[in-house]
Amino acid sequence: MCWVGENIEKTTKINYRYDDVNKVLDKINSCIVDKYNANKYVLCTHEILLKKKVSLHRYLIAVSDADDLTPEILDYLKFNYPDVKVLTELPESADKLNKIIENN
């Protein structure tokens, strides 16, 4: 898995076998939040890329920031991914996200 922000040379690569994935995701989240808070009008483009084909029906657990999703996207998620949680609040860390997911 790797994360690409605005600059491809600053790609953050994650190897789940060796890296503390939650710690790396928290670092990525901080970068996104800091960039967004610095200038609310800047679009923070980012992607998390998975190297192998993944079944979203099996692994997609939650989608965040429901306020930014259109009604069509929400309907699509409800119909095609009924078990996926749509979060209205963004968790501050990967650990907090894990707790939200475990409690729901």
Swiss-Prot record:
Belongs to the mimivirus L28/L54 family. This is Uncharacterized protein L28. It comes from Acanthamoeba polyphaga mimivirus (APMV).
